[in-house]
Design a protein with these regions (language model features):
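Alpha-helical recognition/docking segments in bacterial nutrient-uptake
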Residues: 62-182, 186, 239-241, 345
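An alpha-beta-alpha
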Residues: 180-215, 219-220, 323-337
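Short beta-strand elements in bilobed, periplasmic/extracellular small-molecule ligand-binding domains
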Residues: 98-110, 191-194, 207-233
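Hydrophobic alpha-helical segments within soluble ligand-binding/sensing domains
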Residues: 167-194, 204, 229-238, 298-316
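Periplasmic-binding protein-like
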Residues: 127-136, 191-196, 222, 243-253, ...
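Flexible loop/turn connectors
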Residues: 233, 237-345
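N-terminal helix-turn-helix DNA-binding module of bacterial transcription factors
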Residues: 1-62
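Short, surface-exposed alpha-helical segments at coil->helix boundaries
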Residues: 36, 84, 88-92, 200-207
């Protein structure tokens, strides 16, 4: 029976990718002499026969002096966030930019079971670290930073505060919600509700801004929608059973805003005639819902591209200095804020 590379990897307790790079004599590989010796001896012991075509391709690449970099992206929030319209556009930018640069994107996952995922990542990449990693979203599990440090040589994070030696690119979450608030304020709204998600810096910004402008927001209309359409719709509907809605509701993302609009409409309220609603992110659906959503546009795909460029630059240059880059956002005015009604008034 023909021995596979996977069997060699399992016998050695390392990844298949590492076995491939050792047996194909990848000159860019950094691995301990003991691990290299262990893999080579196990392959010989099992009489493993390398794929001649693959070996020839590897050799031709070396001869052409082409180094194919290996990077990944990782979310420490949840696997469901990877498929979220916001993250999916960022990932699209990462993959597009990587494809332009002879770079393989090997890892892409969320951390539903953080401990299990950490163990899997260490098993796969600790002996053969990736050239770099892009971290999406907030770092919920601080202990997993040690894992990232072991599986990737360089890191670009998209939330501030990861560490002082990694590059950062992103949008200032604490400030990006302000254009929506200021727009509603200019339209004359005095009574507000807030839809947020957990530990949400946009929510904190909204509370402080409303307080500073002496505008009201009642406790019953400060609702945790968990950043999802369904939860926001359900909780807004429950609030509407007991309380009259405020004149304007500011949501920390578009999905919660859309869920809010649906709950209002099902309860007999009109948007924006009775209640104005704004979102954040400008996901594709925002422009195509029944009441097109006023929102803050974040340049998501460009963020992914920039993160990849920064990462590749650092890998290739080996620079020590870190870079912090913030990308601006902009208000997109659509029907849900009621500006057409106010302009006529």
């Amino acid at each position: 029976m023909k021995i596979t590379m996977q069997e060699v990897a399992e016998r050695c307790g390392v990844s298949k990718a590492l076995v491939s790079r050792i047996l194909n004599e990848d000159p860019t590989l950094r691995v301990t002499p003991a691990t290299r010796k262990k893999v080579v001896e196990m392959a010989e012991q099992l009489n493993y026969q390398r794929n001649i075509n693959a070996q020839a391709l590897s050799m031709s690449r070396r001869q052409a002096n082409i180094k194919q970099l290996r990077i990944g992206y990782l979310s420490f929030s949840s696997q469901k966030h990877i498929g979220h319209p916001y993250f999916s556009r960022i990932i699209e930018g990462i993959i597009d930019e990587a494809a332009r640069s002879n770079t393989i994107v090997l890892v892409g996952m969320g951390m539903d079971d953080a401990q299990k995922q950490a163990e899997n990542l260490l098993k796969e990449y600790a002996d053969d670290p990736l050239d770099g990693m892009i971290l999406l979203g907030r770092l919920d599990e601080k202990k997993l930073k040690r894992v990232v440090d072991r599986i990737a040589r360089y890191v670009v994070c998209m939330n501030k505060g990861y560490d002082k030696k990694s590059d950062y690119v992103g949008t200032d979450a604490s400030l990006s919600i302000l254009p929506a608030l200021e727009h509603l304020y200019k339209l004359g709204y005095k009574d507000y509700g807030l839809l947020y998600g957990g530990d949400d810096v946009r929510y904190e910004t909204c509370v402080n801004w409303l307080r500073n402008h002496q505008l009201s927001v009642s406790p019953e209309w400060q609702i945790d929608g968990e950043f999802t359409l369904s939860v926001a719709q359900e909780r807004v509907a429950k609030a509407l059973e007991k309380y009259k809605p405020p004149r304007a509701i500011v949501a920390s993302n578009d999905e919660m805003a859309i869920g809010c609009i649906r709950a209002l409409q099902q309860a007999g309220y009109s948007v924006p005639e009775d209640v104005a609603v704004t979102g954040h992110d400008d996901i594709l659906l925002a422009a195509y819902v029944e009441v097109p959503l006023t929102t803050v546009h974040v340049y998501k795909k460009e963020l992914g591209r920039l993160a990849t460029r920064m990462l590749l630059d650092r890998i290739q240059s080996g620079r020590k200095a870190t870079i912090e880059l913030e990308v601006s956002s902009k208000l997109v005015r659509r029907d849900s804020c009621g500006y057409k009604l106010r302009d006529k008034a």
